[in-house]
Amino acid sequence: MGGRGIDLAIVGAGPAGCGLAAALRLQGWGGAITLLEIGRGPGGRAATRRSRQDPTLAINHGAPLFNIRGGPEPALLEPLRSGGWIEPFPGAIHSLDGEGQLGPAIDDGFSDGSLYQGRGGMEQLSRGLLALAQGSPGATELRSGCLVRHLQPEAEGWTLTGADGAPLLQCRWLVLSGTLLAHH
């Protein structure tokens, strides 16, 4: 088990968790960060699944793209673009009705603004954010394949316990970046 040397534990390494780690590093925060992810790597529900039988078949699920609209561009956008992690979305957005008919995009605001996708799959957004966090001063660690089963508040922070009941780590601060524990 990791000791109290971990300042911040982030449960979930999707765009929210990796984005938080990258934003903290961009702001100059030097505390030790550990991200815990149940999946094989970063991405969470913004990922691309590939067929084992057909390597050309790839399906984005969850968040197939993201948009930036209104206000100034987020500071993390340019390093993600220039690092090759994301690219403009070149396609068109359509809707599919209950009859299976293709129609125009629904006017819900989600397809407005500048649209981006991960280059090579949506998990590249999270991989890029994680790379930005790891390339900055301060320790940033990703623990993949790590199920957090229980959160125990302590006098000076938190103890996180795994599926087998054994403590995973202790930390000063804790962020839950998704609905993760609701599934178990």
Residue ranges and their predicted role:
Residues 9-11, 36, 148, 167-183:
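Short hydrophobic core segments
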Residues 141-159:
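A conserved short coil-to-beta-strand element within the FAD-binding core of flavoproteins
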Residues 29, 47-94:
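N-terminal FAD cofactor-binding segment of flavoenzymes
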Residues 9-13, 23-53:
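Glycine-rich FAD pyrophosphate-binding loop
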Residues 3-9:
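Extreme N-terminal starter segment of soluble prokaryotic enzymes
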Residues 17-18:
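N-terminal Rossmann-fold NAD(P) dinucleotide-binding loop
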Residues 31, 84, 131-141, 155:
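A short helix-to-beta-strand connector/capping loop
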Residues 65-72, 101-131, 143:
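Short beta-strand to alpha-helix junction loop
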